[in-house]
Swiss-Prot record:
NCBIfam families: PRK00823.1-2
Main enzyme class: lyase
Entry keyword set: Lyase
GO molecular function terms attached to this record: 4-alpha-hydroxytetrahydrobiopterin dehydratase activity
UniProt cross-references to HAMAP family, sorted A to Z: Pterin_4_alpha
Catalytic activity: (4aS,6R)-4a-hydroxy-L-erythro-5,6,7,8-tetrahydrobiopterin = (6R)-L-erythro-6,7-dihydrobiopterin + H2O
Top-level taxon of origin: Bacteria
InterPro entries according to UniProt: PCD_sf, Pterin_deHydtase
GO terms under biological process: tetrahydrobiopterin biosynthetic process
Species annotation: Streptomyces avermitilis (strain ATCC 31267 / DSM 46492 / JCM 5070 / NBRC 14893 / NCIMB 12804 / NRRL 8165 / MA-4680)
Protein name stated in the entry: Putative pterin-4-alpha-carbinolamine dehydratase
Family to which this protein belongs: Belongs to the pterin-4-alpha-carbinolamine dehydratase family.
EC number: 4.2.1.96
Pfam families, per the entry: Pterin_4a
């Protein structure tokens, strides 16, 4: 099944279901605060595992107690697609287990 870019309305509707996520130009993004650098690093590893499973990868940034990610779909020219929201939902599901807020 081909991946298609989402419309602005579709993006806004999906973002409404993912508090903390926002549209940043041509990508969706979110930052998480964690209790320690080690916890943040562990979350990055967990996100990387999910990305490999989905075969869909974000830009991840690890800071002192913060993990930030931005995601869009390169295969459709860098637009936001359902794949990006699938990854965002998976990250939202794993974040509480790392103590992320």
């Amino acid at each position: 099944m081909p991946v298609e870019p989402l419309s602005q309305k579709e993006i806004e509707d999906r973002l409404a279901e993912l508090p903390g996520w926002s549209l940043d130009g041509d990508r969706i993004s979110r930052s998480y605060r964690l209790g320690s650098h080690f916890a943040a690093a562990a979350m990055v590893v967990h996100i990387a595992q999910v990305q490999e499973e989905l075969d869909h990868h974000s830009d991840l940034t690890l800071s002192y107690h913060t993990v930030s990610l931005t995601v869009n779909t390169h295969s459709v020219g860098g637009a936001v697609t359902e794949l990006d929201f699938a990854l965002a939902r998976r990250v939202e599901d794993l974040a509480p287990g790392h103590g992320a807020s």
